């Protein structure tokens, strides 16, 4: 039963999001805001996190092509020495993105938080979500269920061997997402509108 439920969750998400995913900058529609989903620049081993690097490159590509005007970086900063939004902001600025085009959401602890807060706190009803395809699929599905018109720009993925742990984690995250939606789970912090 568990395997069947995981399979149904996975197929449902893929079916509902396939037409909203883009890999080519010249074919993606423009939106004012790109929601960049956070991750750490380094792995626990100390090596560079390719998920981070590829998301930064995808965001720069969209911005420089005029497909987004502003970037909302949503990520975790619960620990003093761990700040996904600030690290991503630094990386974007090093690639020539002006600071005035970057906004930070420090309470994007989970994809649910990032997506819902983009609407409820930052007032966005239309978004281009930027992450790897597997993550974009889930984020777009969450956006739809929360009344947000979202498309996704797929950053390059990490090779299957390096991303095996992430892919397994993603299958479980999809199941949890359906449970959260069924229970009307809200972000950890909602806060005042900005």
Where are these regions (language model features)?
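Short, small-residue-biased leader/transition segments that mark boundaries at the very start
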Residues: 3-4
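A transmembrane-helix-recognition feature enriched in membrane-embedded lipid enzymes
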Residues: 164-186
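Short linear elements at protein peripheries
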Residues: 185-194
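A structural signal for short, hydrophobic/glycine-enriched beta-strand patches
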Residues: 11-167
């Amino acid at each position: 039963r568990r395997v069947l439920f995981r399979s149904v969750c996975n197929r449902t998400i893929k079916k509902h999001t396939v037409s909203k995913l883009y890999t080519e900058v010249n074919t993606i529609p423009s939106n004012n805001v790109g929601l960049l989903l956070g991750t750490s620049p380094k792995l626990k081993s100390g090596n560079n996190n390719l998920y981070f690097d590829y998301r930064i490159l995808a965001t720069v590509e969209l911005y420089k092509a005029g497909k987004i005007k502003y970037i909302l970086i949503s990520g975790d900063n619960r620990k003093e020495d761990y700040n996904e939004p600030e690290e991503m902001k630094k990386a974007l600025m090093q690639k020539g993105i002006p600071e005035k085009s970057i906004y930070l959401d420090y309470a994007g602890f989970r994809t649910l938080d990032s997506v819902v807060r983009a609407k409820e706190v930052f007032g966005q009803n239309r978004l281009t979500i930027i992450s790897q395809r597997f993550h974009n699929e889930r984020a777009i599905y969450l956006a739809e269920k929360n009344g947000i018109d979202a498309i996704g720009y797929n950053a390059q993925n990490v090779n299957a061997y390096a991303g095996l742990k992430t892919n397994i984690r993603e299958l479980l995250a999809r199941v949890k997402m359906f449970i959260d939606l069924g229970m009307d789970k809200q972000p950890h912090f909602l806060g005042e509108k900005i």
